[in-house]
Amino acid sequence: MNQYIQGRFYFLFLSIVSGLINLISQGESDSQAEAIKMGEISVSANRIAKETFRTPNSISVIEKSQMERITATITPQILAETVGILAQQTTVGQGSPILRGLTGYQTLLQIDNVRLNNSTFRSGPNQYLSTIAPHGLDRIEVLRGPNSMLYGSGAIGGVISVYSHRLNYRNDKKFSLVPLANLRFTSAQSGRVGMLGLHGGTNDLAFFVTSSVRRFGNQKLGSGYNLHYNNRKFEIVGDKPDPLPKNSWIKKDEEPLGWSGIDATAKLGYKINKDQQISFCYQTWRQPELNRYDKISTKEYELYQFSPQNRNLLYATYESKKPIKFIDEATVTLSYQQQLEGRKQIKATNLNEQKEQFDEVGTFGLSGQAVSTSLPQQRIIFGGDFYLDRLSSRTVKTNLATRIEQVDSDWGRFPNNSSASDLNLFAQSEVEVWSDLQLVLGGRLTHYDLQADLSSRDTSFGLYQKSGQALTGNTGVVFSITENLNWVANFGTAFRSPNLNDTTVVEVTNEGIDAPSLDIDPESSWTLEAGLKANFSRFIGAATLYHSEIRDLISRVPVKEAYDGKDLPKLYKDIQLENPDTEIFIQDNIDQTQIRGIELSGTVVLNSRLTMYGHGTITRGRILKNNGEPPNPEEFWAERIRREAPPMGMIALQWKAPKKPYWCKFYVRGAMEQRRLSRGDIRDPRIQGKTRDPKLVEFDENGLALDAGTPGWYTLNLRGGVKLGQLVRLNMNIENLLNRRYRQHGSGISSPGFNLTTSLSTSF
């Protein structure tokens, strides 16, 4: 951006801000301003409801009203405006939150306290949070930082807890019935979403039912073009190059990206008596097919689809107050979750063969916890959980000329009949040392098992079995400097056991093809964080500094590099023979990795009508040691972590007059450039550049890539809503007013250009 355009942008922004403040504050005194409170209640930080201001953890809570105003089409998009989160998208209809430099299986996801993660989750960004529809949610809690002590394996980067619509019991026996409806339209994707729901009940019976359907078209981008190279890399350019570079092509919009889906949720609750209740929930998601754009745009594949992406969840929860003398409350949940994922591929070099792989994971879960305040000045939470995965996997190859199918029932992406399980016991104590000082202490013991038979592909690999134990802990401090200002600190350890994706998968990735890797160790980490939390009448906010070190971080290594000078096993040779133009990778442990960062967020009430909100995040990662040695200082990429988030943030001004049915919001989102690239980033077709060879990338003296990486970006946006009578709400969101073309770091698709989203909701 030249200085003239940049100057105009800042002048426009400051003019809008000044105009809003002057217009809205006319005739008002400070005494008329409404007070705000840090009334956010979180469950995920302590596995029991507690005010976030009084916890040592870094937590964000997104309430139902906020989600309705954001008008997201998939659940990960709701998190894009949350401090500390980079909402990556490999393709449309999918999204993966990156917390503190980690994503995929290093971030734990759960729905209604039932674990969503299973043993097939991969290391990079995945699509599984998108299988929870944004309609019918009550709130989302984001716990940043390690919490294996409460949630077990995988909670290294953080925990994202999604809660479905709560059951509402009446105060009397009269039966109530409330219909719900929502229509949503988006212009940039020609998207349509429709939802119908029903909730009601009596004083001892409550239910909630909702279902939605959605259909989206191709994605319209901002001004400019995508310039693709035949080495699978690309760049965003403002004008068409004339002439085009050799072996390159131009794309104005990104297609084919149309997709559709359907979901449904049903909940039923019954109060047995005043101290006991039981609830049941069924949830389903159906996504018939979805194109993976970064595989198609590179012309590597003629067809690459997730087909299908389905999920079913059924659980029952029993809750009891005072079941025995020293227990205040207890909860037990029994669950079964089924996830079916299919991949459909046609390579550009072999148009006569279609390859389909189907992986179905059935997960049985049992969890329970109890809360006791029988000891003076403390609250104890203890419990355990058990999860068991059973995997069915197969491959179907079809000759498109003859329509003859060849079925391999022994192996899809994984060996058929593989299994994984983990058993956990935990306890945590909150101790009030005195009125201004609170300590939180806890620990968890985990035992895990993996089993897979690889002998059908290579008898030398045979039956793979791995088990182990881990002990993790947590210590937190909350010190009240004043009634409205807390100093908090937290030290926690976390771990992640290798899963089936680490050890047994044969899968196409953005770098090449992953192959089985049996000789890897669990990841472990420790994190120290400290900061301030403010809760004043007209300002709430938080500032957090953190430092993490991860031992044995699992990362890809080219198989030829790992077996340098040695003969490759038959399995690897066979995979290479099937994919002669694709590099094969296995997993290995990185000795020591460091991630540091700062997270800032705050809300200020300027007067009774105008509120300002903002947040910012900086993340820095570094590999300290690998194979017993520090990285080569001349190879800048060797010390970088994968997908390090750029400095990013948001600032917003919201106007809402007291007792008025309408509101509006102007906000700016953006990120600085990210040119701190790892070897995997340089090879990744989703990250801009001209070459996939790190040795051909130019770097400056600070180790920043000069001709690769993600440029900085910002968008100007408007959002508003009005209540039409007592039953109908209309919300509108205008994104990317300047129609800029940009892509989030690590994403496989560009973000929409000028985009109008309209949402019409009613509750009869």
How should each PLM-predicted stretch be described?
Residues 116-146:
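Short acidic/polar hinge/loop motifs at secondary-structure boundaries
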Residues 432-439, 447-448, 546-549, 571-573, ...:
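Gram-negative outer-membrane beta-barrel transporters
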Residues 269-271, 307, 314, 489-492, ...:
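Conserved C-terminal beta-signal and adjacent last beta-strands/turns
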Residues 187-216, 225-288, 310-312, 374-378, ...:
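Transmembrane beta-barrel wall of Gram-negative outer-membrane proteins
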Residues 271-273, 377-381, 385, 416-551, ...:
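Structural signature of Gram-negative outer-membrane beta-barrels, strongest in the C-terminal barrel
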Residues 255-259, 271, 275-327, 338-362, ...:
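Flexible loop and strand-edge segments within Gram-negative outer membrane beta-barrel domains
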Residues 359, 363-370, 422, 517-521, ...:
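Outer membrane beta-barrel strand-and-loop segments of large Gram-negative receptors
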Residues 75-78, 95-98, 110, 127-130, ...:
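N-terminal periplasmic accessory domains that precede
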